[in-house]
Amino acid sequence: MSEVKSRKKSGPKGAPAAEPGKRSEGGKTPVARSSGGGGWADPRTCLSLLSLGTCLGLAWFVFQQSEKFAKVENQYQLLKLETNEFQQLQSKISLISEKWQKSEAIMEQLKSFQIIAHLKRLQEEINEVKTWSNRITEKQDILNNSLTTLSQDITKVDQSTTSMAKDVGLKITSVKTDIRRISGLVTDVISLTDSVQELENKIEKVEKNTVKNIGDLLSSSIDRTATLRKTASENSQRINSVKKTLTELKSDFDKHTDRFLSLEGDRAKVLKTVTFANDLKPKVYNLKKDFSRLEPLVNDLTLRIGRLVTDLLQREKEIAFLSEKISNLTIVQAEIKDIKDEIAHISDMN
């Protein structure tokens, strides 16, 4: 550009000098014009190159700006999505807060109705009934064991009395045979026979008394065992009925708990829970009635158990009495042996 300006400035100064040349040399003017046209072509190319460079720079700048704009658009869309998600979360949080408020209101209403306290009382009463039933079963097992031991003791006593009676009978027969053999002895032998007869009469009386006592004991024990078995069967039936009622109560309680847990935070379901609680009231009243009916039954069972204990003590006393009688029989047997020894000694002396 500086060269072009210098050439433009030098152009008019050299024009008057060139006019005589033009006039003198007419053939040299086209060469000068051609040389001036080559000077003008260089700035045009420079301008075109500069315009191309600027266009390329602008294109590159526009391309970078478009990339940045695309990135900004993506970020804007991501922000839109995040704002939508944030709005959805806010709506969910608002719904959860509303449900929480409703649930708190429902819990306050339920606390006002005191259903949970009634359910806890029901559970405690059911546990008490379970403990009562377990105690009754344990007492029944104890009674059965005592009955078996009684029957075993009675059989042992019967066997011992029969064996003792057989031994006494054999000994009496042996004594009678010995007395018959020694019938020709002196008055001492007669006195001995009289004493032996008296002893035999005493033994017969003792045997009769023992047989009577054993028969009375057996009859009374049989009657008592029959009554005990009847009472035990009745108690087992009552216990089974109580167990059935307990299972029914458990099933009802499980159903009610399932219903109570399935309640949600709507007014209609709250009303259903209220009606359910109103339905539970007569059932609780019926349960209280059943428990009030069970209490006299349990008292009767305790009285019967006390009677059984007294009967067992009486039987132990009777067994002790029988053992004393058996000891007396052993003493009588020892006396009979002594008499036999004396009779044998007298026969040896004779």
UniProtKB/Swiss-Prot annotation:
Principal subcellular localization: endoplasmic reticulum
GO CC annotations on file: endoplasmic reticulum; endoplasmic reticulum membrane; membrane; nucleolus
Keyword Protein biosynthesis attributed: no
Keywords, ordered alphabetically: Coiled coil, Endoplasmic reticulum, Glycoprotein, Membrane, Transmembrane, Transmembrane helix
Coiled-coil region: 184-217
GO BP field: response to X-ray
Keyword Transmembrane: yes
Membrane topology category: Single-pass membrane protein
InterPro entries with a match to the protein in the record: Inh_kappa-B_kinase-int (IPR024152)
Domain of life: Eukaryota
Compositionally biased intervals (Basic residues): 1-11
Spans traversing the lipid bilayer: 46-62
Tissue expression summary: Expressed in vein endothelial cells. Isoform 4 is expressed in lung, kidney, spleen, thymus and skeletal muscle.
Glycan-linked positions: 144, 328
Induction: By X-ray irradiation.
Residues covered by region (Disordered): 1-39
Cellular compartment(s): Endoplasmic reticulum membrane
Modifications after synthesis and translation: N-glycosylated.
Note in the entry: Shares a common promoter with APAF1 from which the 2 genes are transcribed in opposite directions.
Function: Target of p53/TP53 with pro-apoptotic function.
Record's protein name: Inhibitor of nuclear factor kappa-B kinase-interacting protein
Organism of origin: Homo sapiens (Human)
